[in-house]
Amino acid sequence: MASKSADIRPKITLACEVCKERNYITTKNRRNHPDRLELQKFCPRCTAKTAHRETR
């Protein structure tokens, strides 16, 4: 059975919107952010700061 903290804060992968490479793994709080997370992060493949969006 999964722990309570894993249910509330699942691991998510952030993928670059430009090249679709999955660069970052993080956790998020489902209660505060039920929608897909989108952050500005550095993409080493694009060598630029681009939007990274949560993947399923």
Curated annotation (Swiss-Prot):
GO molecular function annotations of the record: structural constituent of ribosome
Keyword terms of this UniProt record: Ribonucleoprotein, Ribosomal protein
Any coiled-coil regions, as ranges: none
Top-level taxon in the UniProt lineage: Bacteria
GO CC annotation terms, alphabetical: cytoplasm; ribonucleoprotein complex; ribosome
InterPro entries: Ribosomal_bL33, Ribosomal_bL33_CS, Ribosomal_bL33_sf, Ribosomal_zn-bd
Record-level GO BP terms: translation
PANTHER family in UniProt: 50S RIBOSOMAL PROTEIN L33, CHLOROPLASTIC, LARGE RIBOSOMAL SUBUNIT PROTEIN BL33C
Similarity field: Belongs to the bacterial ribosomal protein bL33 family.
Protein name as annotated: Large ribosomal subunit protein bL33
Gene giving rise to this polypeptide: rpmG
